Amino acid sequence: MQTSNITNHERNDSSWMSTVKSTTEVSWNKLSFCDVLLKIITFGIYSPHETLAEKYSEKKLMDSFSPSLSQDKMDGEFAHANIDGISIRLCLNKGICSVFYLDGDKIQSTQLSSKEYNNLLSSLPPKQFNLGKVHTITAPVSGNFKTHKPAPEVIETAINCCTSIIPNDDYFPVKDTDFNSVWHDIYRDIRASNSNSTKIYFNNIEIPLKLIADLINELGINEFIDSKKELQMLSYNQVNKIINSNFPQQDLCFQTEKLLFTSLFQDPAFISALTSAFWQSLHITSSSVEHIYAQIMSENIENRLNFMPEQRVINNCGHIIKINAVVPKNDTAISASGGRAYEVSSSILPSHITCNGVGINKIETSYLVHAGTLPSSEGLRNAIPPESRQVSFAIISPDV
């Protein structure tokens, strides 16, 4: 088995990207497993640029990987495989992922960039891989969507938690740039939302979208904001103006909510928790959405929803954000830090309903924002390291 593509590249470059062109023109059945693994890490298994046959070959290779046992994880090993007699190990150590493989009688290794690492994780088989104490990823899992409800009810259910995927460049996910896009991400999401799209909860209390829209406007988050700007916290009078414009001043029924939001909107850690949850790099890429749609169509599912042939009814995407205050072990935990910490759970739910069936995909990211975290790219980067994320991914298609 020739592994020169990877080995030579290891000597000349820290990234595998520069060798992709040397493999993409080769007939697929002539590629070595190293070349296939290279394409997976470079593009991801769900890349729309590859054929279904290529994706099948990639999936077959990735299915060879199994979770490593705890006693095998001295160097951070979390997955291993034996392919064509060659041992491959995937390791994560101090936030850096490396691929180890046996080349003759020598062990070769290559470090992955963060993008390559994410492509690798999203391509692992439906088994649970543990990556340290705070990072667990569950790879794609297939399920069955069974219902006897009529098509209109199925569509309504999907719409209630979804909004249209935004097709143009003004709102499309930007490059993976280490939180530099977060202000634009929340602006795009809120501006494009409607009553059935983004849902935001604090301690299970839904926060009205108009209230959030007024908040980000007062914070100066707009289409022209500098991506590296640190947000300036609002004064009591500024927050009070936002609250009074959204709740009737004389109505005592909203008094509890008004006091709650007045407190939250002056807490930098809450603003950090809220804005970071919209960072699109935490969630889903357009290629993943395209893959789900292609998968549903390629499976040739029977027309269960009784739609017109070739009718594409829904291509939707919803965003659900849950922020919960962390209950301190003692009263000093709040006073010493000047605020409280927040747990953030941010889910995105793209769904596709076509004449051929229903596809639902969920990606959920959970992390902790510590008390006093400042709403800035630097503050978010320090508060939310990549290894703290927990991502779940599922595809549901109709039972054939």
Curated annotation (Swiss-Prot):
Record's keyword terms, sorted: Hydrolase, Plasmid, Protease, Secreted, Thiol protease, Virulence
Catalytic center residues: C34
Gene Ontology biological process terms in this record: proteolysis
Region span, Tubulin-binding domain: 224-315
GO MF terms held by the record: cysteine-type endopeptidase activity
Coiled coil: none
tRNA processing listed as a keyword: no
Gene Ontology annotations for the cellular component aspect, listed alphabetically: extracellular region
EC number(s) stated in the UniProt entry for this protein: 3.4.22.-
Record carries keyword Secreted: yes
Location within or outside the cell: Secreted
Domain of life where this protein originates: Bacteria
Family: Belongs to the protease EspG/VirA family.
Subunit structure comment from the entry: Monomer. Interacts specifically with alpha tubulin, a major component of microtubule.
Function noted in UniProt: Alpha-tubulin-specific protease that is required for entry into epithelial cells and for subsequent intra- and intercellular spreading. Contributes to bacterial entry into epithelial cells by inducing microtubule (MT) destabilization and the formation of membrane ruffles. The membrane ruffling evoked by VirA results from the activation of host rac1, which is associated with the destruction of MT networks. Creates a tunnel inside the host cell cytoplasm by breaking down the microtubule infrastructure.
Protein name, entry field: Cysteine protease-like VirA
Taxonomic lineage: Bacteria, Pseudomonadati, Pseudomonadota, Gammaproteobacteria, Enterobacterales
